Design a protein with these regions (language model features):
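Long, contiguous internal "core" modules enriched in hydrophobic/ aromatic residues
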Residues: 44-155
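Internal mixed beta-strand/loop scaffold within catalytic domains of large alpha/beta enzymes
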Residues: 1-53
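Conserved small/polar residues in nucleotide/adenosyl-binding loops
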Residues: 159-160
Length: 160
């Protein structure tokens, strides 16, 4: 995230983030990941000189259910459209590109959203956006997990 940012003379910065990774025992409940982060660069008087946010979330089902996947993306689009109607298209593409595995010629999982170096909103609104990304992730993921957590499975599915 720092590669396109110019260096400040004092080199002070702060990076804060929260990551959540879920690897459930039941293979009918997908693995998922969520991350939100804020970076700040400071001038010699310790004032914020520059800042940006990043984050996202993605879903990697062991046993894909098309209705879960469609709803996952539908909820992400609905949420992001309330901020900016270009966000879903851009952030979904970023997720697909970020989680592409070249030697397999495939993506990891079924997608989600990913963004970095974002600074479209004020810092206050950006922090609110990050909070809402985390809440949206929890709502979307828990909806799937709650629906699938009691689905029976054989021990052979654990060793996929």
């Amino acid at each position: 995230a720092l590669k396109n940012k110019k260096k400040l003379s004092n080199g002070k910065f702060s990076a804060m983030g929260v990551s959540v990774i879920s690897h459930p025992k039941n293979p009918h409940v997908p693995t998922s990941h969520m991350n939100v982060r804020l970076f700040c660069l400071f001038d010699s008087d310790d004032n914020i000189k520059d800042w940006w946010i990043g984050g996202g979330y993605d879903l990697t089902p062991y046993l894909p259910y098309s209705d879960d996947i469609k709803d996952w993306h539908k909820q992400a689009k609905h949420f992001l459209d309330s901020f900016d109607e270009t966000y879903y298209k851009n952030f979904s593409k970023e997720c697909n590109d970020y989680f592409y595995i070249p030697h397999r010629k495939e993506r990891r999982g079924v997608g989600g959203i990913f963004f970095d170096n974002e600074k479209d909103l004020s810092i206050e609104n950006s922090l609110s956006f990050l909070e809402n990304v985390a809440k949206q992730y929890l709502n979307s993921y828990l909806k799937i997990a709650s629906k699938r957590k009691d689905t029976e499975y054989s021990l052979s599915l654990i060793h996929i």
